[in-house]
Amino acid sequence: MMNDSFGARLRRERERRHITLAQIADTTKIKASLFQGLERDDVSRWPGGIFRRSFVRAYAQAIGLDPEQTCREFVER
């Protein structure tokens, strides 16, 4: 079993659904570069606090994952 990072799992799920980062950015009105960072497990350029959780929820919803579960996994990583 692969021991993927949180970001790598999100990217795999997004690609499996044939959704581009540009599509997510268009849907969420959040820059694609921020989601690229999420998929690389690098959120250093993100605003802090509640915004991070909001971005993760928006990404999850845009690719069809459970937003609350995904957010919990993000916080616990």
Residue ranges and their predicted role:
Residues M1-R77:
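Cytosolic/nucleoplasmic/matrix-facing N-terminal domains/tails
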